[in-house]
Amino acid sequence: VPEYLLSIYQPDTGAPDAETMDRIMADLHRLNEELRDSGSWVFTGGLHGPGSATVVRADGLITDGPYLEGKEHIGGIWVITAPDLDAALAWGRKAAAATTLPIEIRPFQDVPPF
């Protein structure tokens, strides 16, 4: 079964107020339960802000901060299984509704395991 990465595009403007965040977290909990119950859930996780990032380059150079500067960053991800892109997009719509943020859906390459 194909796997897909769902990435949350989070603005750098800060977190919503506590009441809104409580509602979002409740909606995310319901979405994650629905993903688990359907057998589509593989992994999910929220990320710290871009200021916590460290970039390691092939030449050994290590720098603090995100690789790219921008007004948005990846705030969290899901890895899901879905029979096809349409099914993954349906999960993406649910994720966008739960988070109130844009969700990017990308299929993993179909390569043999190492």
Which stretches of residues belong to each language-model region?
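Conserved, structured core segments of small domains
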Residues: 1-114
